[in-house]
Amino acid sequence: AGPPTSADLRAAGWAEAVALLAAASGEVGTVTSPEGGSATAEVDGEGIRVTVRCGDPLDATVLRSYCVGAAHMAWSWVTSESLVVDDEGVVHDLTVRSFDVVRATETPPIEVTIEPDDGEPCNGSDAVFAAVAAATWLTRGAPETWPTGT
């Protein structure tokens, strides 16, 4: 049972595959989403640095905001988020606070570079999400369990 979910959610399924491939190869490289957006990410003690290419942005400010949000979501997903279940695997608390989402003020600085591209606009933030998740996990040494701790 459990809460309802969907494969339509941000990078569901393929972001995990990207992280596993990065752990196996020891590097993230360029991540390309099914929609065609691509991203790279570096994570270290200085912060999170992202490049994104996803066609000619409709609005660069909005794209940058989506990418910052995706990077924050990925960092939090790998380092602190979890669901608490009972002995039967039933979730009893689905509040934002119960997920242990990293507060924005506790997230490393995020730098986004939008690479020039005159192609048709497409979703780039999902590629950012997957790239940052993989880079965060690699930076942590690819431990066997998530969350890895902040």
Predicted regions and their residues:
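C-terminal catalytic domains of large/alpha subunits in multi-subunit enzymes
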Residues: 1-150
